[in-house]
Swiss-Prot record:
Motif 'KMSKS' region location, chain numbering: 593-597
Keywords of the record: Aminoacyl-tRNA synthetase, ATP-binding, Cytoplasm, Ligase, Metal-binding, Nucleotide-binding, Protein biosynthesis, Zinc
Catalytic activity: tRNA(Ile) + L-isoleucine + ATP = L-isoleucyl-tRNA(Ile) + AMP + diphosphate
Motif 'HIGH' region, chain ranges: 57-67
Family to which the UniProt record says this protein belongs: Belongs to the class-I aminoacyl-tRNA synthetase family. IleS type 1 subfamily.
Entry binding sites for L-isoleucyl-5'-AMP: E552
Quaternary structure (record): Monomer.
Organism: Pseudothermotoga lettingae (strain ATCC BAA-301 / DSM 14385 / NBRC 107922 / TMO)
Protein name (database record): Isoleucine--tRNA ligase
A Gene Ontology BP annotation from the UniProt entry: isoleucyl-tRNA aminoacylation
Amino acid sequence: MDYRSTLNLPGTEFSMRANLVEKEPRILEKWQKMNIYDYLLKHRENNPTFVLHDGPPYANGDIHIGTAMNKILKDIVVRYKTLRGFKSPYVPGWDTHGLPIEHKVTTMLGEKARSMSQTELRKACEEFAKQQIEMQKKQFQRLGVIGDWENYYATLNPEYEYKIYEIFAKLVEDGYVYRALKPVLWCNNCGTALAQAEIEYHDHDSPSIYVKFKMENSENEYIIIWTTTPWTLPGNTGIAVHPDQQYVKIEVGSEIWILAEKLLKMAMQEIGIDEYRILEKFKGHFLEGKQAVHPIFDRKSRIITADFVDMETGTGCVHIAPGHGEEDYEFGHLVNGLAVISPVDEKGYFTEEAGKYSGMHIEKANKQIIEDLKNNGSLLKESTIKHSYPHCWRCKKPVIFRATEQWFISVEKNNLRQRVLENIQNVAWIPAWGKNRISAMVEERPDWCISRQRAWGTPIPAFRCSKCSEVVLDARLIRHFAEIVKKMGTNAWFELSEKQLLPDGYVCPHCGSEDLVKMNDTLDVWIDSGSSFEAVLTTRPELTFPADMYLEGSDQHRGWFNSSLVLSVITHDKPPYKTVLTHGFIKDAEGKKMSKSLGNVVDPLEVCSKYGADVLRLWLASSDYFNDIRISKNIIFQQVEVYKKIRNTIRYLLGNLQDFSVTDSIGFQKMLPVDRWALGRLQQIIKSVTEAYESYEFSKAYNILVKYCSVELSAIYLDIVKDRLYVEGKHSLKRRSAQTVLYNILKSLLVMFSPILAFTCEEAYEFLNFGEKKYQTVMAENWPEYKEEYIDTNLMNDFEELLQLRDLVLKALEESRQNGLIGHSLDAKVAIKTGSKKTLDLLKKYSAYLEEFFIVSKVEICNSDENLHIEVEHAEGEKCERCWKYDPLTNSDSEFPNICPRCMAVLKEKR
């Protein structure tokens, strides 16, 4: 007789095969139709708000694994906060101005770009940026990111630009903005100034030269400098020494050289001098004010003292070119009055001020300058050095310091630096080291160069007077132009005449002339994105200022976190965020940086089209994202295997609940002991997972949940209750007791996993039809509540010991299986022998449940003088064809042949 039809076998349409590639787009369509974003906001309408403010990615090119990671992390946070009951609006944004887009557009246009007006080029950039936004928007949505995608913000929108000018007017009005000739980081290739946040450091080969400058009024005395930028020597006007370090005069042949004592030995080895004699020792300040003669140009080079001179490399005598370095400018020009000579144009060619090097590119001039030094006897040593050197973030070319007239924000005005540092203390930084990092950056940052020499940007509404040549910029001009921008956008600056741009009756405040000419500088894009707190948070009623969280990569300590903080402190005297959460960067499996040339790039869209977005999300959740994390095709495949285990657990739970309704639930006290233990463990899991999410340790939540599914559920609890679920009467207390726990586990798992496995949990939630209150989406559910009353401490302690015993029993069963004594564990009878009263009492207390607990046919508890000992025998009696357990009374009823008494009772009840 076939008894299979009498078993309560699991059944569900939730498929074992994920097929996420086909299912995820259908779920996205569902979310779009139901307008999930508005649905969730309305669902939490009267609840406390949690605002994660989106740092705008750059609207240029397909999303990559880094931008995908950032958006998924934000989505996990927003989904978690929504499930915790918060109204969690999320407005995505895009950074749209600046060099990368202009560079891309001019490259695409080729020769045509050269003949275009600024307005035409700007319109081409705007069109390109908008296309990129639409493309990236679809790609971010494909990752499962929920947000207000129809009402995103973009820095090119007139209403956003208007807010930039509101902030800028305040900066000018309060005296923070000034114009000066100062050395700034400059990209010759792109022809513009750069901010610190636009710099990347890469290894670079530079010439390394030791040069002697003859001391004035001396026949044979020289001061020795070392430099890796020979091209800056035409800008040299001084030499710096440390005031308190020891310097020496040494005799080398017929010459006397001056350099630092600490660097003497190293420098002599580098130059190749074996024989020299120390003549004199003195402190560096004794050299202050003396003059040396420039080795190429007919001018003097004054010796100054500066504390920044270090004793690590070189000679302790630093060549100073105030037009080509921040410290050179500060100590050379501002402190000591050295002339600023910067004979390099915007493309890196020497100007007429460089004399015979005029018209020569600085790279080519390097070689010529070295040759000239060699020919006039000033060059002591030439070699090549590999060192970390600043490069442009866009074109990847080395940058230089070049003195040009630029607009700056003073970080000393109105005690700004100190105020920013104080406000840093009022923010929660995760990880905690972020506080020290951004503090160090603020402490060290120079005045902020905010002007750029590009067409595609937010124009600085400044004018130059044709009569007196003074530059004019004031708050009235900015606010007047802001009103024009509100109606026409910033293209108005390039399309309208000066008369149309100026307020009625406006004249030069310096000389009274009406003849003012508009200038063409644009604002640093970090002003654009850094103004988002004003342009987005304060203007949208569903958002709050300050935001609850900013979440970006750790590079944003010097980027968006920094610019936003400075502007917010100036305008509101408080930070724009309450918490700052940072993530690391993505490397390949070996920890190498990703690059197309190495062939180690993982495309997030490719992962989605091959495995599904949930696998990508699972990989991210598995990673300690506070630090740099690794990815490769193999690492992704490992997560595919983990995903299968999770999905199978969900499927098994759904399958065994097919005939369950919440009205069938059994009260805690009526449950079987193992079910009460499982429900207690679920509470502990809920507590641990919640704590992990609360501290944004998603990898911790992942590890707890994955281990729970694969070990505690699959290998322990679900294994133990399988017999009861399949064999006991459908409506019996024993079966409903287990089903009640399974229902609680399933619902808790779906909610706790849903911030990570957004699509899979949504799919599974659709199969949750157990008569409970249900919403259109799992995201509308409430986070599982930790219930202390479900934790019976004594019972939990008992089961901790029983589980240790179970491990020993399973080990003994496996040995018996290997020896051929048994096949399946149900073939076994287990005798547990011990002299421990504590263990005997424990086993007797749960004796009625031990066969199920150990998954055997018979358990005997034996008092013994020996230590704990487990014996396995083949069980007595015949095997029941329905439940596979052995029982001496099997086949004792002709109506139900080959059936044990337990199964017989179930079948008679069914009848």
